[in-house]
Amino acid sequence: MAHAYRDDFPLLKSQDVAYLDNAATAQRPQCVLDAVTEFYKSQNANPLRGLYPLSIAATEAYENAREAVRSFLNAKSSREIIFTRNTTESINLVAYSYGLSHVKAGDEVLVSIMEHHSNLLPWQMVCRQAGASLKFMECEMDGTLDLNKVEALITPKTKIVACTHVSNVLGRVNPIRELAALAHRAGAVLVVDGAQSTPHIPVDVQALDADFFAFSGHKVYGPMGIGVLYGREELLNAMPPFLTGGEMIESVTRDGAVFAELPHKFEAGTVNAADAAGLHAAIDYVKSIGFTAMHQQEVALTRRAMDAIGEMPHVHVLGSEKPEEHCGIITFTVDGVHPHDISEILASDGVAIRAGHHCAQPLLAYLKHPSTARASLAFYNTESEVDRLLDSISTLRERMGYGK
């Protein structure tokens, strides 16, 4: 299946590398590059501001991208789709605009131990400024959240529950709909980091019942520099702007301003229309392949890797023993070999992986691993690339002087 799409990705054709760092950023298909280039070639004007044809065309491209995202997430309205720079900015928008307005002294914010720092540090900030408490949902060693334990942590003081949809370390898909029900029963809102789920599984924010959902374009085969925040319209309407300035106003006087309606209230300044057009192309590309086909390829490759690693006594995979529960993420350690050495040796073999704490230090501390190596697969990866990874891993200890 992967070979049918390899030619769509210029970098994969031009570089002799087994690119297995897709959880950090994905490669871009030619159609995405073309969409960004075409915007600058034929539609380059400031959107939303001019009444001349170029500006109108730029506005249409930008708003068409918003509608594509709405459909991709199955949001009720395009007014619920806010363009940002990335997942980090999206979550910070919620923290500063909703969190600081609703979390008071003595309140509680509940986050999972699996969070990327982008869905942790903003809530640390909110709790610190508000005088609230930050509590953690801890997981089992395979990444499973025990909903009974979670329910016991949620109290009438809980105002926000924040959870990643898919862990960027363990690949575990979290029970978002069930978490939403528990949060809403207590009167809290649920904030979901969808950076790792959107490239791998269908997302329906209405079915998930999420109040806020954030993701980045660059992880779902789109450009860097464009991100998305979905928020329930009634919540967004009641929130103050995150940034102020041009375009996000209806009128300004010496004494104040009347802010624009959704979604533009949260999109101050010149917007990133070119990368929005690229994200639109990426979404169309993903839809043309389908998540079912992508998932089948990723699971097959994950199984191939995990089956082989299971025969290597000094190599240990974190998380579930089931390949289908990893979303293509294989985080591992090798006895006696530092993850940075693993990454450097694999790089010398033409295999690109990630090493470190993966911006999830509390999780790795909880799992008692200060650092790990991570290979993350996409549908365009091949069996030969996985075998290249496995060949390198199998010789690591010998090359480090430990013998076989």
Question: Where are the regions a protein language model picked out?
Answer:
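Pyridoxal 5′-phosphate
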Residues: M1-K404
